[in-house]
């Protein structure tokens, strides 16, 4: 399952933060090609689903995951173009993972566009983050995936949206295959 909680402007501690529109686009594109479930924040309610103590967005995500037996949630975010890393994967030092298949599948993919960091800067460890809250409440693997904006926005020469989409598509397909191989009756 894919999550894009910052698809619209959001308010964190009284400060309006810009929308991460490309994460919504990415989630929609992956839904179209893979038919995987998505949740995308489409209306600004002066809130931040990845920060506020109470969040209807997180509640809806947890409810969906529980009712539909989702195995993994990728929580998509955009990283500032000023950062060096191409990706930062937040797992709360592995606490948000229920298996080791998910992280190894993600980290195995070499995009050839920049560094992939794990649990540096954005660990997704705060109790009100989408990843930590969903992992705990729904007992599911959940990874916060921070993608550098310079690879998602056409304004940058490093633009590589199609490669990122294709890599995530390949990763999701691989995870589905791995989980199917590990189902026991």
State where each predicted segment sits.
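N-terminal catalytic or cofactor-binding beta/alpha core of small enzyme domains
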Residues: 1-151, 155-185
């Amino acid at each position: 399952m894919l999550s894009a909680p910052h698809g619209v402007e959001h308010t964190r501690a009284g400060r309006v933060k810009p929308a991460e529109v490309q994460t919504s686009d990415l989630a929609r594109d992956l839904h179209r090609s893979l038919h995987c479930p998505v949740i995308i924040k489409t209306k600004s309610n002066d809130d931040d689903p990845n920060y506020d103590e109470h969040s209807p967005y997180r509640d809806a995500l947890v409810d969906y995951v529980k009712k539909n037996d989702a195995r993994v949630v990728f929580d998509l975010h955009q990283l500032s173009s000023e950062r060096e890393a191409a990706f930062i994967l937040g797992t709360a030092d592995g606490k948000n993972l229920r298996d080791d298949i998910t992280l190894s599948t993600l980290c195995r993919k070499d995009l050839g566009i920049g560094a992939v960091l794990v649990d540096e800067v954005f660990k997704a460890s705060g109790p009100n983050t989408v990843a930590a809250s969903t992992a705990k409440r729904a007992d599911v693997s959940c990874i916060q995936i921070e993608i550098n904006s310079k690879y998602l926005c056409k304004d940058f020469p490093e633009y590589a949206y199609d490669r990122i989409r294709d890599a995530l598509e390949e990763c999701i397909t691989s995870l589905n295959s791995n989980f199917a191989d590990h189902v026991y009756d």
